[in-house]
Amino acid sequence: MDQPWMRQDDDESDDESSTVDFGQAVDGILFLIDATEGMFEEVDGDTAFMQCIKAAKSTMLNKITSSPKDLVGIILFGTDKDNNPNRFKNVYVLQDLESPGAESVLKLEKLIADGPKKFKQEYGHGNVNMADVLWTCALMFSKSRAGQRRVLVLTNQDDPHKGSGDLDDKAVVKAKDLLQSGIELDLVHLKPPGDKKFRPQILYKNLVTDKENYEDGFPEASDKMEELLLRVRMKDHKKRRLMSLPFWLGPEVKMSVSLYNLVRPTGKPATTRLARDNNEELLSRRITYAMDSAEALMPGDISKTQEYGGRKAYFDICEVKQIKSMAPPGLQLLGFKPLSYLEKQPHVRPSHFVYPDEGSVRGSTRLFAALLQSCLRHRVAPICFWISRAAQAPKLVYLLAQEEERDPHGLQMVPPGFHVVQLPFSDDRRRLQALQEGTTKATPGLVALAREMAEKLRFTYHPDKFENPELQGFWSCLEALALDRDDAEHPKDYTRPDHEKMKAKAGEEMDAFLEAAFPDGCSATTAGSRKRTQAGEGGQAKKARSENQGSNVDVREEAKRGKLASLTVSVLRDFCKQEGLRCPSKKAEIVDCIKKHLKL
Protein backbone atom coordinates (compact mmCIF):
# COMPACT_ATOMS: atom_id res chain seq x y z
CA MET A 1 0.00 0.00 0.00
CA ASP A 2 1.64 3.21 -1.13
CA GLN A 3 1.11 6.74 0.11
CA PRO A 4 2.00 10.00 -1.60
CA TRP A 5 5.41 11.16 -0.42
CA MET A 6 4.48 14.59 0.84
CA ARG A 7 5.64 16.72 3.72
CA GLN A 8 3.76 15.57 6.76
CA ASP A 9 3.04 17.57 9.89
CA ASP A 10 5.17 15.29 12.03
CA ASP A 11 8.18 15.89 9.76
CA GLU A 12 8.06 19.58 10.58
CA SER A 13 7.31 19.22 14.27
CA ASP A 14 9.03 21.39 16.83
CA ASP A 15 12.37 20.27 18.14
CA GLU A 16 11.21 20.26 21.72
CA SER A 17 8.34 17.85 20.99
CA SER A 18 10.27 15.49 18.75
CA THR A 19 13.58 15.20 20.55
CA VAL A 20 12.74 14.38 24.15
CA ASP A 21 9.68 12.71 25.63
CA PHE A 22 9.08 14.79 28.73
CA GLY A 23 6.43 12.38 29.96
CA GLN A 24 9.07 9.73 30.66
CA ALA A 25 11.38 12.08 32.57
CA VAL A 26 10.16 12.19 36.19
CA ASP A 27 11.92 14.45 38.69
CA GLY A 28 12.07 13.70 42.39
CA ILE A 29 12.79 16.20 45.16
CA LEU A 30 13.07 15.60 48.91
CA PHE A 31 12.71 18.50 51.34
CA LEU A 32 14.84 18.06 54.47
CA ILE A 33 13.36 20.53 56.95
CA ASP A 34 15.08 21.23 60.24
CA ALA A 35 12.64 20.76 63.15
CA THR A 36 14.95 21.66 66.05
CA GLU A 37 14.00 24.32 68.59
CA GLY A 38 16.07 27.00 66.83
CA MET A 39 13.70 26.86 63.84
CA PHE A 40 10.71 27.79 66.04
CA GLU A 41 11.90 31.12 67.42
CA GLU A 42 9.24 33.63 66.43
CA VAL A 43 10.26 36.69 64.40
CA ASP A 44 7.61 39.18 63.22
CA GLY A 45 4.84 36.72 64.04
CA ASP A 46 6.29 33.83 62.02
CA THR A 47 8.86 31.06 62.48
CA ALA A 48 11.50 29.72 60.12
CA PHE A 49 9.98 26.23 60.30
CA MET A 50 6.53 27.41 59.20
CA GLN A 51 8.12 29.38 56.35
CA CYS A 52 9.80 26.18 55.14
CA ILE A 53 6.50 24.26 55.31
CA LYS A 54 4.82 27.02 53.29
CA ALA A 55 7.62 26.84 50.72
CA ALA A 56 7.16 23.06 50.43
CA LYS A 57 3.41 23.54 50.01
CA SER A 58 3.99 26.15 47.29
CA THR A 59 6.29 23.70 45.49
CA MET A 60 3.63 20.99 45.65
CA LEU A 61 1.00 23.30 44.17
CA ASN A 62 3.40 24.27 41.38
CA LYS A 63 4.15 20.62 40.67
CA ILE A 64 0.44 19.77 40.49
CA THR A 65 -0.08 22.40 37.79
CA SER A 66 3.19 22.17 35.85
CA SER A 67 4.61 18.65 36.41
CA PRO A 68 1.93 16.39 37.92
CA LYS A 69 4.04 13.24 37.52
CA ASP A 70 7.02 14.58 39.49
CA LEU A 71 7.66 13.22 42.97
CA VAL A 72 7.85 15.31 46.15
CA GLY A 73 8.71 14.13 49.66
CA ILE A 74 9.24 15.82 53.04
CA ILE A 75 11.52 14.65 55.85
CA LEU A 76 11.69 16.38 59.22
CA PHE A 77 14.95 15.97 61.11
CA GLY A 78 15.59 16.94 64.71
CA THR A 79 12.22 15.69 65.99
CA ASP A 80 11.68 13.72 69.19
CA LYS A 81 9.53 11.10 67.47
CA ASP A 82 10.67 9.04 64.48
CA ASN A 83 8.92 7.63 61.41
CA ASN A 84 11.24 6.11 58.79
CA PRO A 85 11.97 2.66 57.28
CA ASN A 86 15.23 2.15 59.21
CA ARG A 87 13.85 3.39 62.54
CA PHE A 88 16.53 6.06 62.83
CA LYS A 89 16.03 8.33 65.81
CA ASN A 90 14.97 11.97 65.30
CA VAL A 91 14.04 11.40 61.61
CA TYR A 92 10.35 11.74 60.69
CA VAL A 93 9.07 11.11 57.13
CA LEU A 94 6.18 13.56 56.92
CA GLN A 95 5.41 12.95 53.24
CA ASP A 96 6.48 9.91 51.23
CA LEU A 97 8.16 10.44 47.87
CA GLU A 98 5.12 10.46 45.57
CA SER A 99 3.19 12.65 43.18
CA PRO A 100 1.62 15.51 45.16
CA GLY A 101 -2.14 15.63 45.45
CA ALA A 102 -4.95 17.19 47.43
CA GLU A 103 -4.32 14.99 50.49
CA SER A 104 -0.66 16.02 50.84
CA VAL A 105 -1.49 19.73 50.42
CA LEU A 106 -4.28 19.56 53.02
CA LYS A 107 -1.89 17.81 55.42
CA LEU A 108 0.57 20.70 55.20
CA GLU A 109 -2.21 23.26 55.56
CA LYS A 110 -3.34 21.55 58.76
CA LEU A 111 0.25 21.57 60.07
CA ILE A 112 0.47 25.32 59.41
CA ALA A 113 -2.92 26.00 61.00
CA ASP A 114 -2.12 23.99 64.16
CA GLY A 115 0.93 26.12 64.90
CA PRO A 116 4.19 25.51 66.80
CA LYS A 117 2.59 24.44 70.09
CA LYS A 118 0.63 21.59 68.52
CA PHE A 119 3.73 20.55 66.57
CA LYS A 120 5.78 20.29 69.77
CA GLN A 121 3.09 18.06 71.31
CA GLU A 122 2.86 15.71 68.31
CA TYR A 123 6.47 15.62 67.06
CA GLY A 124 8.67 17.24 69.71
CA HIS A 125 12.29 18.36 69.35
CA GLY A 126 15.48 16.31 69.55
CA ASN A 127 19.05 15.93 68.34
CA VAL A 128 20.33 15.69 64.75
CA ASN A 129 22.40 13.05 62.96
CA MET A 130 22.74 14.15 59.33
CA ALA A 131 24.24 10.80 58.28
CA ASP A 132 21.00 9.04 59.29
CA VAL A 133 18.94 11.71 57.53
CA LEU A 134 20.88 11.32 54.26
CA TRP A 135 20.70 7.52 54.56
CA THR A 136 16.91 7.82 54.73
CA CYS A 137 16.96 9.97 51.58
CA ALA A 138 18.98 7.35 49.68
CA LEU A 139 16.57 4.61 50.77
CA MET A 140 13.50 6.57 49.66
CA PHE A 141 15.02 7.36 46.27
CA SER A 142 16.04 3.72 45.74
CA LYS A 143 12.36 2.73 45.87
CA SER A 144 11.21 5.47 43.46
CA ARG A 145 11.19 5.80 39.67
CA ALA A 146 12.63 9.33 39.68
CA GLY A 147 15.16 10.10 36.96
CA GLN A 148 16.60 13.37 38.25
CA ARG A 149 16.88 13.19 42.05
CA ARG A 150 17.52 16.15 44.35
CA VAL A 151 17.66 16.75 48.09
CA LEU A 152 17.00 20.27 49.40
CA VAL A 153 18.03 21.08 52.98
CA LEU A 154 16.18 23.97 54.68
CA THR A 155 17.65 25.11 57.98
CA ASN A 156 18.89 28.10 59.97
CA GLN A 157 21.27 26.04 62.15
CA ASP A 158 24.82 26.00 60.76
CA ASP A 159 26.11 23.47 63.35
CA PRO A 160 23.50 20.71 63.67
CA HIS A 161 25.87 18.33 65.49
CA LYS A 162 26.87 20.88 68.15
CA GLY A 163 30.60 20.59 67.47
CA SER A 164 30.78 16.80 67.08
CA GLY A 165 33.50 16.21 64.48
CA ASP A 166 32.72 12.48 64.32
CA LEU A 167 29.12 13.12 63.25
CA ASP A 168 30.31 15.74 60.75
CA ASP A 169 32.68 13.23 59.12
CA LYS A 170 29.95 10.59 58.88
CA ALA A 171 27.62 13.11 57.22
CA VAL A 172 30.28 14.07 54.65
CA VAL A 173 30.89 10.40 53.80
CA LYS A 174 27.15 9.82 53.35
CA ALA A 175 26.86 12.92 51.15
CA LYS A 176 29.55 11.47 48.87
CA ASP A 177 27.57 8.22 48.71
CA LEU A 178 24.53 10.19 47.56
CA LEU A 179 26.60 11.85 44.83
CA GLN A 180 27.81 8.46 43.58
CA SER A 181 24.18 7.32 43.44
CA GLY A 182 23.26 10.30 41.26
CA ILE A 183 21.47 12.24 44.01
CA GLU A 184 22.17 15.98 44.15
CA LEU A 185 22.17 17.80 47.49
CA ASP A 186 21.67 21.54 47.85
CA LEU A 187 21.12 24.01 50.66
CA VAL A 188 18.63 26.82 51.26
CA HIS A 189 19.73 28.46 54.50
CA LEU A 190 17.64 30.90 56.49
CA LYS A 191 18.77 33.72 58.74
CA PRO A 192 19.51 32.48 62.28
CA PRO A 193 17.67 34.17 65.15
CA GLY A 194 19.24 37.27 66.63
CA ASP A 195 22.35 38.85 65.15
CA LYS A 196 24.06 35.57 64.31
CA LYS A 197 25.34 34.77 60.83
CA PHE A 198 24.96 31.45 59.08
CA ARG A 199 28.39 29.80 58.68
CA PRO A 200 28.18 27.13 55.95
CA GLN A 201 31.87 26.27 56.25
CA ILE A 202 31.18 24.39 59.50
CA LEU A 203 29.38 21.50 57.74
CA TYR A 204 27.07 22.26 54.83
CA LYS A 205 29.79 23.55 52.50
CA ASN A 206 31.17 19.99 52.47
CA LEU A 207 27.75 18.41 51.90
CA VAL A 208 26.43 20.28 48.84
CA THR A 209 26.95 18.58 45.49
CA ASP A 210 27.74 21.48 43.16
CA LYS A 211 30.54 23.21 45.05
CA GLU A 212 31.53 25.25 41.96
CA ASN A 213 28.44 27.42 42.41
CA TYR A 214 29.75 28.49 45.81
CA GLU A 215 33.35 29.29 44.90
CA ASP A 216 32.63 32.99 45.45
CA GLY A 217 30.91 32.24 48.76
CA PHE A 218 27.38 31.33 49.80
CA PRO A 219 24.61 33.88 49.29
CA GLU A 220 23.33 35.71 52.33
CA ALA A 221 20.72 33.88 54.39
CA SER A 222 17.13 34.69 53.47
CA ASP A 223 14.95 36.30 56.13
CA LYS A 224 11.80 37.05 54.11
CA MET A 225 9.12 34.66 52.91
CA GLU A 226 9.20 35.99 49.35
CA GLU A 227 12.96 35.52 49.13
CA LEU A 228 12.70 31.99 50.54
CA LEU A 229 10.04 31.04 47.97
CA LEU A 230 12.20 32.45 45.17
CA ARG A 231 15.26 30.46 46.25
CA VAL A 232 13.31 27.23 46.69
CA ARG A 233 11.74 27.69 43.27
CA MET A 234 15.14 28.30 41.67
CA LYS A 235 16.68 25.26 43.37
CA ASP A 236 13.74 23.04 42.51
CA HIS A 237 13.16 24.21 38.94
CA LYS A 238 16.39 22.99 37.40
CA LYS A 239 16.23 23.08 33.64
CA ARG A 240 15.98 19.69 31.99
CA ARG A 241 18.14 19.66 28.91
CA LEU A 242 16.39 19.29 25.62
CA MET A 243 19.24 17.54 23.83
CA SER A 244 23.01 17.15 23.75
CA LEU A 245 24.79 17.97 20.48
CA PRO A 246 28.35 18.17 19.16
CA PHE A 247 29.53 21.69 18.27
CA TRP A 248 32.14 21.67 15.48
CA LEU A 249 34.39 24.75 15.43
CA GLY A 250 36.61 23.23 12.75
CA PRO A 251 37.48 19.92 11.08
CA GLU A 252 39.31 18.66 14.17
CA VAL A 253 37.92 20.91 16.93
CA LYS A 254 34.75 19.71 18.63
CA MET A 255 33.02 20.29 21.94
CA SER A 256 29.73 19.08 23.38
CA VAL A 257 26.85 21.39 24.29
CA SER A 258 23.39 20.98 25.81
CA LEU A 259 20.30 22.82 24.62
CA TYR A 260 17.59 24.12 26.94
CA ASN A 261 14.26 25.87 26.61
CA LEU A 262 14.37 28.96 28.83
CA VAL A 263 10.95 30.44 28.09
CA ARG A 264 7.92 28.87 26.46
CA PRO A 265 4.22 29.78 26.60
CA THR A 266 2.24 27.81 29.17
CA GLY A 267 -0.99 26.20 28.05
CA LYS A 268 -3.71 24.14 29.62
CA PRO A 269 -2.88 20.47 30.18
CA ALA A 270 -3.87 17.97 27.53
CA THR A 271 -7.13 16.13 28.01
CA THR A 272 -6.76 12.63 29.42
CA ARG A 273 -9.25 9.97 28.36
CA LEU A 274 -10.59 7.83 31.21
CA ALA A 275 -12.60 4.63 31.31
CA ARG A 276 -16.23 5.20 32.23
CA ASP A 277 -16.49 2.36 34.76
CA ASN A 278 -13.26 2.72 36.80
CA ASN A 279 -11.73 6.10 35.76
CA GLU A 280 -8.48 4.44 34.69
CA GLU A 281 -6.43 6.16 31.99
CA LEU A 282 -6.99 4.78 28.50
CA LEU A 283 -4.10 4.06 26.16
CA SER A 284 -4.52 5.01 22.50
CA ARG A 285 -3.22 2.81 19.69
CA ARG A 286 -3.10 3.53 15.97
CA ILE A 287 -3.19 0.68 13.45
CA THR A 288 -2.92 1.05 9.66
CA TYR A 289 -4.99 -1.30 7.50
CA ALA A 290 -4.80 -2.15 3.80
CA MET A 291 -7.77 -0.79 1.88
CA ASP A 292 -8.26 -3.88 -0.28
CA SER A 293 -7.84 -6.69 2.28
CA ALA A 294 -8.36 -4.88 5.62
CA GLU A 295 -5.15 -6.53 6.82
CA ALA A 296 -3.19 -4.81 9.60
CA LEU A 297 0.08 -3.38 8.27
CA MET A 298 3.40 -3.16 10.04
CA PRO A 299 5.61 -0.07 9.57
CA GLY A 300 7.91 -2.06 7.26
CA ASP A 301 4.96 -2.87 4.98
CA ILE A 302 4.28 0.80 4.22
CA SER A 303 6.08 2.62 1.41
CA LYS A 304 5.92 6.15 0.06
CA THR A 305 5.96 7.27 -3.55
CA GLN A 306 7.04 10.21 -5.64
CA GLU A 307 6.10 10.58 -9.31
CA TYR A 308 8.90 11.39 -11.78
CA GLY A 309 8.36 11.50 -15.53
CA GLY A 310 4.97 9.84 -15.29
CA ARG A 311 6.29 6.89 -13.26
CA LYS A 312 6.12 6.26 -9.53
CA ALA A 313 9.28 5.74 -7.52
CA TYR A 314 8.79 3.71 -4.33
CA PHE A 315 10.70 4.31 -1.10
CA ASP A 316 10.52 2.40 2.15
CA ILE A 317 10.72 4.16 5.52
CA CYS A 318 14.48 3.63 5.92
CA GLU A 319 15.21 5.07 2.46
CA VAL A 320 13.08 8.13 3.20
CA LYS A 321 15.04 8.76 6.40
CA GLN A 322 18.35 8.41 4.55
CA ILE A 323 17.24 10.88 1.87
CA LYS A 324 16.21 13.42 4.48
CA SER A 325 19.44 13.07 6.49
CA MET A 326 21.71 15.74 5.04
CA ALA A 327 24.24 15.58 7.88
CA PRO A 328 24.53 14.18 11.40
CA PRO A 329 22.89 16.21 14.18
CA GLY A 330 25.00 19.03 15.59
CA LEU A 331 26.13 22.63 15.29
CA GLN A 332 28.69 23.54 12.61
CA LEU A 333 30.42 26.93 12.81
CA LEU A 334 30.32 28.85 9.51
CA GLY A 335 31.68 32.25 10.52
CA PHE A 336 30.97 35.41 12.52
CA LYS A 337 28.80 38.49 12.02
CA PRO A 338 28.70 41.75 14.00
CA LEU A 339 25.75 42.18 16.36
CA SER A 340 24.75 45.42 14.64
CA TYR A 341 23.89 43.42 11.52
CA LEU A 342 22.01 40.64 13.30
CA GLU A 343 19.86 42.94 15.42
CA LYS A 344 17.87 43.80 12.29
CA GLN A 345 16.97 40.19 11.54
CA PRO A 346 13.27 39.30 11.93
CA HIS A 347 11.96 36.89 14.54
CA VAL A 348 11.28 33.37 13.21
CA ARG A 349 10.65 31.23 16.30
CA PRO A 350 11.54 31.10 20.04
CA SER A 351 15.21 30.66 20.79
CA HIS A 352 17.02 27.91 22.69
CA PHE A 353 19.86 28.25 25.18
CA VAL A 354 23.27 26.56 24.80
CA TYR A 355 25.45 25.49 27.72
CA PRO A 356 28.60 23.32 27.71
CA ASP A 357 28.30 19.58 28.39
CA GLU A 358 31.51 18.54 30.12
CA GLY A 359 30.25 15.01 30.69
CA SER A 360 30.26 14.11 26.98
CA VAL A 361 33.51 15.76 25.82
CA ARG A 362 36.20 16.78 28.30
CA GLY A 363 37.40 20.35 27.91
CA SER A 364 34.07 21.58 26.52
CA THR A 365 33.61 24.06 29.39
CA ARG A 366 36.96 25.80 28.80
CA LEU A 367 36.52 26.00 25.04
CA PHE A 368 32.95 27.22 25.44
CA ALA A 369 34.00 29.89 27.96
CA ALA A 370 36.77 31.12 25.65
CA LEU A 371 34.33 31.42 22.74
CA LEU A 372 31.77 33.20 24.92
CA GLN A 373 34.25 35.76 26.25
CA SER A 374 35.63 36.46 22.77
CA CYS A 375 32.15 37.06 21.37
CA LEU A 376 31.26 39.39 24.25
CA ARG A 377 34.52 41.32 23.88
CA HIS A 378 34.32 41.78 20.10
CA ARG A 379 30.48 42.08 19.95
CA VAL A 380 30.08 39.38 17.32
CA ALA A 381 27.88 36.31 16.98
CA PRO A 382 28.80 32.92 15.49
CA ILE A 383 26.77 31.88 12.44
CA CYS A 384 26.08 28.14 12.52
CA PHE A 385 24.53 25.36 10.49
CA TRP A 386 22.18 23.49 12.88
CA ILE A 387 20.57 20.07 12.59
CA SER A 388 18.76 19.19 15.79
CA ARG A 389 18.06 15.51 15.11
CA ALA A 390 18.34 12.86 12.44
CA ALA A 391 16.21 13.50 9.33
CA GLN A 392 15.49 17.05 10.52
CA ALA A 393 15.62 19.94 8.07
CA PRO A 394 18.79 22.06 8.55
CA LYS A 395 18.54 25.58 9.91
CA LEU A 396 20.76 28.64 9.85
CA VAL A 397 21.19 30.14 13.31
CA TYR A 398 23.33 32.67 15.11
CA LEU A 399 24.50 32.40 18.72
CA LEU A 400 23.78 35.48 20.84
CA ALA A 401 26.23 35.66 23.76
CA GLN A 402 24.85 36.28 27.25
CA GLU A 403 26.95 37.34 30.24
CA GLU A 404 26.37 36.01 33.75
CA GLU A 405 24.51 38.25 36.21
CA ARG A 406 24.17 37.85 39.98
CA ASP A 407 22.01 39.64 42.55
CA PRO A 408 23.49 41.56 45.53
CA HIS A 409 23.35 38.36 47.61
CA GLY A 410 25.50 36.45 45.12
CA LEU A 411 22.64 34.37 43.71
CA GLN A 412 22.87 33.74 39.97
CA MET A 413 20.02 35.47 38.15
CA VAL A 414 21.18 35.15 34.51
CA PRO A 415 23.36 32.21 33.41
CA PRO A 416 26.28 32.59 30.98
CA GLY A 417 25.83 31.00 27.58
CA PHE A 418 24.48 31.48 24.05
CA HIS A 419 20.95 31.95 22.78
CA VAL A 420 20.34 29.97 19.57
CA VAL A 421 18.36 32.33 17.31
CA GLN A 422 17.07 31.00 14.00
CA LEU A 423 17.71 33.04 10.86
CA PRO A 424 15.08 33.19 8.09
CA PHE A 425 15.59 31.73 4.64
CA SER A 426 14.68 33.80 1.59
CA ASP A 427 11.29 32.10 1.15
CA ASP A 428 10.41 32.84 4.79
CA ARG A 429 10.11 36.54 4.00
CA ARG A 430 6.67 37.72 2.92
CA ARG A 431 6.11 40.17 0.10
CA LEU A 432 4.15 43.02 1.66
CA GLN A 433 1.93 45.30 -0.38
CA ALA A 434 2.84 49.00 -0.41
CA LEU A 435 0.62 51.33 1.61
CA GLN A 436 -2.11 53.04 -0.33
CA GLU A 437 -1.58 56.70 -1.06
CA GLY A 438 -3.82 59.25 0.54
CA THR A 439 -3.67 57.85 4.06
CA THR A 440 -4.06 60.39 6.84
CA LYS A 441 -0.82 61.32 8.57
CA ALA A 442 -0.47 62.82 12.01
CA THR A 443 0.82 66.37 12.30
CA PRO A 444 4.19 67.01 14.00
CA GLY A 445 2.38 68.64 16.92
CA LEU A 446 0.15 65.62 17.43
CA VAL A 447 3.17 63.31 17.28
CA ALA A 448 4.91 65.42 19.94
CA LEU A 449 1.86 65.21 22.23
CA ALA A 450 1.68 61.44 21.75
CA ARG A 451 5.38 61.15 22.57
CA GLU A 452 4.94 63.13 25.80
CA MET A 453 2.00 60.93 26.81
CA ALA A 454 3.94 57.73 26.06
CA GLU A 455 6.98 58.95 28.02
CA LYS A 456 4.84 59.52 31.11
CA LEU A 457 3.24 56.06 30.83
CA ARG A 458 6.50 54.20 30.25
CA PHE A 459 7.47 51.47 32.75
CA THR A 460 9.90 48.57 32.94
CA TYR A 461 8.22 45.44 31.60
CA HIS A 462 9.01 42.01 32.99
CA PRO A 463 6.97 38.92 32.03
CA ASP A 464 6.99 37.62 35.63
CA LYS A 465 4.74 40.53 36.62
CA PHE A 466 1.92 39.54 34.24
CA GLU A 467 0.24 36.18 34.69
CA ASN A 468 -2.19 34.72 32.19
CA PRO A 469 -5.60 35.44 33.79
CA GLU A 470 -7.33 32.62 31.92
CA LEU A 471 -4.79 30.02 33.11
CA GLN A 472 -4.82 31.36 36.68
CA GLY A 473 -8.59 31.11 36.81
CA PHE A 474 -8.50 27.60 35.36
CA TRP A 475 -5.99 26.33 37.95
CA SER A 476 -7.79 28.14 40.76
CA CYS A 477 -11.02 26.30 39.94
CA LEU A 478 -9.19 22.95 39.76
CA GLU A 479 -7.47 23.64 43.08
CA ALA A 480 -10.78 24.44 44.77
CA LEU A 481 -12.33 21.29 43.33
CA ALA A 482 -9.43 19.05 44.41
CA LEU A 483 -9.19 20.54 47.92
CA ASP A 484 -13.00 20.44 48.38
CA ARG A 485 -13.33 24.18 48.87
CA ASP A 486 -16.58 26.06 48.37
CA ASP A 487 -15.25 29.05 46.44
CA ALA A 488 -12.29 29.38 44.12
CA GLU A 489 -9.97 32.33 44.40
CA HIS A 490 -10.42 34.93 41.69
CA PRO A 491 -6.93 35.96 40.56
CA LYS A 492 -6.36 39.59 39.69
CA ASP A 493 -6.07 40.34 35.99
CA TYR A 494 -2.86 42.38 35.66
CA THR A 495 -3.25 42.61 31.88
CA ARG A 496 -6.04 45.18 32.23
CA PRO A 497 -4.95 48.84 32.29
CA ASP A 498 -5.02 50.64 35.63
CA HIS A 499 -6.89 53.79 34.59
CA GLU A 500 -6.46 55.52 37.96
CA LYS A 501 -2.67 55.19 37.92
CA MET A 502 -2.52 56.17 34.26
CA LYS A 503 -4.54 59.30 34.93
CA ALA A 504 -2.42 60.17 37.96
CA LYS A 505 0.81 59.85 35.95
CA ALA A 506 -0.23 61.35 32.61
CA GLY A 507 -3.69 62.86 33.02
CA GLU A 508 -2.77 66.26 31.56
CA GLU A 509 -0.88 64.76 28.62
CA MET A 510 -3.77 62.40 27.80
CA ASP A 511 -6.32 65.25 27.83
CA ALA A 512 -4.08 67.41 25.64
CA PHE A 513 -3.67 64.58 23.12
CA LEU A 514 -7.43 63.94 22.97
CA GLU A 515 -8.18 67.63 22.43
CA ALA A 516 -5.66 67.82 19.58
CA ALA A 517 -6.65 64.53 17.94
CA PHE A 518 -10.41 65.00 18.27
CA PRO A 519 -11.34 68.70 18.03
CA ASP A 520 -14.82 70.14 18.62
CA GLY A 521 -17.55 68.19 16.86
CA CYS A 522 -15.57 64.93 16.76
CA SER A 523 -15.09 62.49 19.64
CA ALA A 524 -12.94 59.42 20.00
CA THR A 525 -16.05 57.24 20.38
CA THR A 526 -17.73 58.39 17.17
CA ALA A 527 -14.48 58.21 15.22
CA GLY A 528 -13.87 54.68 16.39
CA SER A 529 -17.40 53.57 15.58
CA ARG A 530 -17.21 55.19 12.13
CA LYS A 531 -13.93 53.34 11.50
CA ARG A 532 -15.52 50.05 12.53
CA THR A 533 -18.54 50.75 10.33
CA GLN A 534 -16.35 51.41 7.33
CA ALA A 535 -14.38 48.24 7.98
CA GLY A 536 -17.59 46.26 8.47
CA GLU A 537 -19.44 47.44 5.39
CA GLY A 538 -19.19 43.88 4.39
CA GLY A 539 -16.77 41.13 3.80
CA GLN A 540 -17.51 41.83 0.16
CA ALA A 541 -15.11 44.78 0.08
CA LYS A 542 -12.39 42.79 1.81
CA LYS A 543 -13.05 39.85 -0.51
CA ALA A 544 -12.91 42.10 -3.55
CA ARG A 545 -9.59 43.54 -2.40
CA SER A 546 -8.10 40.08 -1.91
CA GLU A 547 -9.35 39.01 -5.32
CA ASN A 548 -7.81 42.10 -6.90
CA GLN A 549 -4.52 41.41 -5.15
CA GLY A 550 -4.62 37.81 -6.37
CA SER A 551 -5.38 38.88 -9.93
CA ASN A 552 -2.25 41.03 -9.97
CA VAL A 553 -0.02 37.98 -9.45
CA ASP A 554 1.49 36.49 -12.62
CA VAL A 555 1.27 32.77 -11.81
CA ARG A 556 3.19 31.74 -14.94
CA GLU A 557 6.09 34.02 -14.05
CA GLU A 558 6.08 32.80 -10.44
CA ALA A 559 6.13 29.20 -11.68
CA LYS A 560 9.20 29.88 -13.84
CA ARG A 561 10.95 31.33 -10.80
CA GLY A 562 10.02 28.29 -8.70
CA LYS A 563 7.88 30.35 -6.32
CA LEU A 564 4.53 28.56 -6.73
CA ALA A 565 4.63 27.24 -3.17
CA SER A 566 4.77 30.82 -1.81
CA LEU A 567 1.42 31.74 -3.43
CA THR A 568 -1.85 31.35 -1.56
CA VAL A 569 -4.23 28.48 -2.27
CA SER A 570 -6.94 30.88 -3.49
CA VAL A 571 -4.59 32.36 -6.12
CA LEU A 572 -3.59 28.88 -7.32
CA ARG A 573 -7.21 27.75 -7.53
CA ASP A 574 -8.20 30.86 -9.50
CA PHE A 575 -5.44 30.09 -12.01
CA CYS A 576 -6.67 26.48 -12.34
CA LYS A 577 -10.21 27.72 -13.04
CA GLN A 578 -8.94 30.15 -15.68
CA GLU A 579 -6.95 27.39 -17.40
CA GLY A 580 -9.75 24.82 -17.10
CA LEU A 581 -7.72 22.48 -14.88
CA ARG A 582 -9.11 20.06 -12.31
CA CYS A 583 -8.36 21.59 -8.92
CA PRO A 584 -7.16 19.07 -6.29
CA SER A 585 -7.82 19.55 -2.58
CA LYS A 586 -4.24 19.84 -1.26
CA LYS A 587 -1.87 22.71 -2.04
CA ALA A 588 1.04 20.45 -2.99
CA GLU A 589 -1.15 18.61 -5.50
CA ILE A 590 -2.34 21.93 -6.97
CA VAL A 591 1.29 23.02 -7.42
CA ASP A 592 2.14 19.72 -9.16
CA CYS A 593 -0.91 20.07 -11.40
CA ILE A 594 0.11 23.59 -12.49
CA LYS A 595 3.71 22.47 -13.11
CA LYS A 596 2.49 19.65 -15.37
CA HIS A 597 0.21 22.05 -17.22
CA LEU A 598 3.06 24.51 -17.80
CA LYS A 599 5.47 21.64 -18.60
CA LEU A 600 7.98 22.70 -15.95
Curated annotation (Swiss-Prot):
The places in or outside the cell where this protein is found are:
Nucleus; Chromosome
Under the heading PROSITE patterns, the entry gives:
SAP
MF GO annotations: ATP binding; ATP hydrolysis activity; damaged DNA binding; DNA helicase activity; double-stranded DNA binding; telomeric DNA binding
Quote the Pfam families the UniProt record gives.
Answer: Ku, Ku_C, Ku_N
Reactions performed catalytically: ATP + H2O = ADP + phosphate + H(+)
Any one GO BP annotation for this protein: double-strand break repair via nonhomologous end joining
InterPro entries attached to this UniProt entry: Ku70, Ku70/Ku80_beta-barrel_dom, Ku70_bridge/pillars_dom_sf, KU70_core_dom, Ku_C, Ku_N, SAP_dom, SAP_dom_sf
* Family per record: Belongs to the ku70 family.
Functional summary from the UniProt entry? Single-stranded DNA-dependent ATP-dependent helicase. Involved in non-homologous end joining (NHEJ) DNA double strand break repair. DNA-binding is sequence-independent but has a high affinity to nicks in double-stranded DNA and to the ends of duplex DNA. Binds to naturally occurring chromosomal ends, and therefore provides chromosomal end protection. Required also for telomere recombination to repair telomeric ends in the absence of telomerase. KU70, of the KU70/KU80 heterodimer, binds to the stem loop of TLC1, the RNA component of telomerase. Involved in telomere maintenance.
Q: What is this protein called?
A: ATP-dependent DNA helicase 2 subunit 1
Protein source organism: Rhipicephalus appendiculatus (Brown ear tick)
